Amino acid sequence: MKDIFQNAFLGSLVGDALSMPVHWYYDTSALDRDYGAIDCYLPPRNPHPDSILWRSRYHPINELADILHDQAYFWGQKGVHYHQFLEAGENTLNYQLAIELYRWIILRGGYNSREWLEHYIEVMQTSGWHDDTYVEEVHRNFFTQYARGNKPMNCAVKDPHIGALSQVPALIAGLDALGVPNPDDLTEIVKSHVALTHNHPESIEAAGLLVQLLCDLDEGIPLRQSIANRAVKWIGASTLKDWEQRPDREVVGRKVSTACYLPESMTASLHFAWKYAQDFDKGIQANARVGGDNCHRAAVVGGLLGGTLGVSADWLLELKAMEALRCDKPL
């Protein structure tokens, strides 16, 4: 196995777990007041001042679409934190699925998209499989389509959100563990995997870019050079050089949105990866502190910085996923 791909996966998990308590904070004053510097894993607290769960609704059309289970009780209530029952150092649902994907690939000894969708459906329909309150719209839409009788391969929606990338580092790490190092093969598999749920050109293209950047790191190409060469459509090197001189909240919050929508969420992620190309800790902390969809940006920020710099043991000691990643236990 290649350290770069394995560390990229771990970096994405660390970045998500660090961001988790301030996920979808848009009022940065409230973020600072509630959580301070965010230089270590912290537990979430209610109330969440920017939570929109009070106006979120999901009514499964039948039992096949029931993926909220006991958490449905909290939907429609004000101030509920999206991840209220997670512990400090624990990952959000999309990254718990990423961990499951990684273990599933290794324990099976291979990857098959149809069989993965069957496993995805099984775990999401299992009450208590996870303890996260919020389930993203892409999952709700997928299971609505599935409950209507559509085949799993035909349940994807056109979803242009950076959450599409949350499983990419895990998928690459799993394939790498099985000896699938060819960049072209990795890119094709990753794009097809993302399209299973987020079948939108922006999501698929962003996934392809992340694969290319990680493969460049594996070939010894410096991160900034790779971004400058590969990410021209998303942002130019001259702009990145300008932005690295500015406060992060001026860049991500004013120049580009902190929200989940592509392409701006990818541009924001590339800013952090560029600016903090020599400092993993500062990069994931800066990403967390601007709020918004920091958890899903962590697939890019934590993934690229973890891949190029590695992840220190200090972050891994308190990362709950380290136990979940063990492959000596059955799925």
Model region roles, listed by residue range:
Residues 1-331:
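Structured, active/binding-site neighborhoods that engage oxygen-rich ligands
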